[in-house]
């Protein structure tokens, strides 16, 4: 509170950046954690809350006749434009927000003061919900080829890896340590995902310290051990996710990429995902387009294209699809790296796992995926998200791109994810909110030093409490789809209004009024039809009679033979109109065109997997050992 000199300012206007209607007038409050604006002109009390940690920039605009404007841009893409009557009040609020939004010490972050009135035991249970050993066991590890080792328990192998890592059983301790000395920051090749169907593996690491000619026998042995852990393939891929020119430039600094002549039976491939600085610039250009007050459709589309944002999303998706196809179709193991192996590598390894394994498309599985590939493996959340007052060049929307890639997949396969768009937005918001300890720090060692697991709470129990509102009603369970094969042609990628224009009220100027009304009418009709069908199902909720249960069982068998549907376009004559949030109208009621028997089977199947997931979650929360990531 020492940073707050003016906790309350009255007669503050909140401008609507899309319309010319009269600005709201109210009172602005500054608390220890939030900026709160209370609209006094509204008939019903209306409040706008902005978490200090969500604030990306605060800008004092030139003085006007109406007062002193204050423009706030948030990391969750909320934009608030206030006009404060007195210049002195505006300056004091501006100064306070600069300090409150950019704390210097980790202990000043919201998570260390957040108190949800939860007992110490319940907090510990929350941190036990995700156990990565259980996920490795689900893959069949340990086995004859792979083992979980504690060689890094004192962080001597790599200080940004977790204490336990999965390496080939054939790799000796000397091989592991020798390889770590040849890899940037000691980030040796470790297992990310094992495809049990054919023993092909996705592994990850950082770039080698090869320069123009250096080599390392232990590193060559490590890659050989990874290749031999997959007897079904005579070769393995080594994928560098950087543009080739960037990787070659790193050679001059004594780093670079693997020389195929030094490694047996590897196939090297560059993918070409740009670095964090290009991505940061691209997002800024995208947001400038989104904030244009009255763009024409042509201007908006031109600006979207010039930002390059969707091209970068496509590049990440292309790399992930390549990994998934190499593992599934070619039965080859893949080793992935970028520069340090914690940005682009995390993106493509996690997305490839998501494409291959339906478990990661469920609530708990997605949490496990984030814990395993992002948190445990040392993605620098603190730096990339700008949690503390630091180098702005380290900030980059790497995790935002991952979340958007998942959303793009949800648009192509609306029945394959247990969760909906709001689940992704909740996670994205809390990556920046610093309300929970999961995303603080840069690696496991740093989180231990900060005593994150003793002093803060985990996000995952909080999200599970909201499971009902975050569930996708179209979800068909684990068995409906195994591997996903998305279309990555440019026209397959949509602009995500639900992310970048989420806080904009009313209709955007770039929308045609008639199209908007027609979309709303079509949506209303489909929802009414859906409501009628649900009313007809209500009698079944009391439980069917024995003979009815037998009938339903037979219906389920028949329905299982029905071909699965991917998208609404599969059973619509033409592509449905797209709503303002990026969701196609057909997605809202995709099951309305499926026969009644298939819907009953879908409902039964979804509930079965939901109950199974909850049972597993509860049992692990009670019995599992603490696994801090």
Swiss-Prot record:
InterPro entries: MTMR8_PTP, Myotubularin, Myotubularin-like_Pase_dom, PH-like_dom_sf, Prot-tyrosine_phosphatase-like, Tyr_Pase_AS, Tyr_Pase_cat. Transmembrane segments: none annotated. It catalyses: a 1,2-diacyl-sn-glycero-3-phospho-(1D-myo-inositol-3,5-bisphosphate) + H2O = a 1,2-diacyl-sn-glycero-3-phospho-(1D-myo-inositol-5-phosphate) + phosphate; a 1,2-diacyl-sn-glycero-3-phospho-(1D-myo-inositol-3-phosphate) + H2O = a 1,2-diacyl-sn-glycero-3-phospho-(1D-myo-inositol) + phosphate; 1,2-dioctanoyl-sn-glycero-3-phospho-(1D-myo-inositol-3,5-bisphosphate) + H2O = 1,2-dioctanoyl-sn-glycero-3-phospho-(1D-myo-inositol-5-phosphate) + phosphate. The lineage of its organism: Eukaryota, Metazoa, Chordata, Craniata, Vertebrata. CDD domains: PH-GRAM_MTMR8, PTP-MTMR8. This is Phosphatidylinositol-3,5-bisphosphate 3-phosphatase MTMR8. SUPFAM superfamilies: (Phosphotyrosine protein) phosphatases II (SSF52799), PH domain-like (SSF50729). Its main location: nucleus. It is found in: Nucleus envelope. SMART domains: PTPc_motif. GO terms for cellular component: cytoplasm; nuclear envelope.
């Amino acid at each position: 509170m020492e940073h707050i000199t003016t906790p309350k300012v009255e007669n503050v206007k909140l401008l609507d950046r899309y319309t010319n209607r009269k600005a709201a007038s109210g009172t602005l409050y500054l608390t220890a954690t939030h900026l709160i604006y209370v609209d006094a002109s509204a008939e019903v009390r209306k409040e706008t809350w902005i978490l200090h940690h969500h604030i990306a920039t605060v800008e004092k605009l030139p003085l006007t006749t109406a007062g002193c404007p204050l423009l706030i841009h948030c990391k969750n893409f909320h934009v608030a434009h206030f006009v404060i009557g007195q210049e002195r009040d505006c300056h004091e609020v501006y100064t306070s927000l600069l300090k409150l939004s950019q704390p210097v010490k980790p202990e000043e972050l919201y998570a260390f003061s957040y108190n949800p009135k939860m007992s110490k035991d319940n907090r510990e249970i929350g941190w036990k919900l995700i156990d990565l050993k259980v996920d490795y066991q689900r893959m069949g590890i340990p086995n004859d080829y792979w083992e979980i080792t504690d060689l890094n328990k004192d962080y001597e192998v790599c200080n940004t890896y977790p204490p336990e890592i999965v390496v080939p059983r054939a790799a000796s301790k000397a091989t592991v340590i020798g390889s770590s000395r040849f890899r940037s920051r000691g980030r040796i090749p470790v297992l990310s995902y094992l495809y049990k169907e054919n023993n092909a593996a996705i592994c990850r690491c950082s770039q080698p310290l090869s320069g123009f000619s250096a080599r390392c026998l232990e590193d060559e042995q490590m890659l050989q051990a990874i290749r031999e852990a997959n007897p079904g393939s005579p070769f393995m891929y080594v994928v560098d996710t950087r543009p080739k020119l960037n990787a070659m430039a790193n050679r001059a600094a004594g780093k670079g990429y693997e020389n195929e002549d030094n490694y047996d039976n590897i196939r090297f491939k560059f993918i070409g995902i740009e670095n964090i600085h290009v991505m940061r610039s691209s997002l800024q250009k995208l947001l400038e387009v989104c904030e244009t007050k009255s763009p024409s459709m042509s201007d908006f589309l031109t600006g979207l294209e010039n930002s390059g944002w969707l091209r970068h999303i496509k590049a990440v998706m292309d790399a992930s699809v390549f990994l998934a196809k190499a593992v599934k179709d070619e039965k080859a193991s893949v080793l992935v790296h970028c520069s340090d192996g914690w940005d682009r590598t995390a993106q493509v390894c996690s997305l490839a796992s998501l494409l291959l394994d339906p478990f990661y498309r469920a609530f708990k599985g997605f949490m496990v995926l984030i814990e395993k590939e992002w948190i445990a493996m040392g993605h620098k959340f603190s730096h990339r998200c700008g949690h503390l007052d630091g180098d702005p060049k380290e900030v980059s929307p790497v995790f935002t791109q991952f979340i958007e890639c998942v959303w793009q997949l949800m648009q192509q396969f609306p029945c394959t994810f247990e969760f909906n768009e709001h689940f992704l937005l909740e996670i994205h918001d809390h990556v920046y909110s610093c309300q929970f300890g999961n995303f603080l720090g840069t690696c496991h060692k740093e989180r231990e030093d900060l005593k994150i697991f003793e002093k803060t709470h985990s996000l995952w129990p909080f999200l599970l409490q909201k499971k009902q509102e975050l569930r996708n009603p179209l979800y068909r369970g684990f068995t409906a789809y195994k591997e996903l094969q998305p279309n990555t042609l440019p026209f397959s990628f949509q602009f995500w209004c639900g992310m970048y224009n989420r806080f904009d009220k009313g209709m955007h100027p770039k929308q045609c009024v008639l199209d908007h009304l027609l979309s709303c009418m079509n949506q209303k009709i489909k929802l009414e039809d859906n409501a009628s069908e649900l009313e007809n199902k209500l009698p079944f909720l009391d439980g069917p009679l024995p003979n009815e249960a037998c009938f339903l069982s037979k219906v389920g068998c028949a329905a299982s033979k029905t071909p699965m549907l991917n998208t609404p376009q599969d059973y619509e004559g033409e592509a449905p109109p797209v709503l303002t949030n990026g969701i196609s109208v057909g997605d809202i009621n995709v099951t309305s065109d499926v026969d009644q028997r298939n819907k009953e089977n879908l409902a039964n199947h979804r509930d079965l997997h939901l109950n199974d997931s909850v049972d597993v979650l509860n049992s692990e929360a009670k019995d599992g050992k603490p696994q801090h990531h």
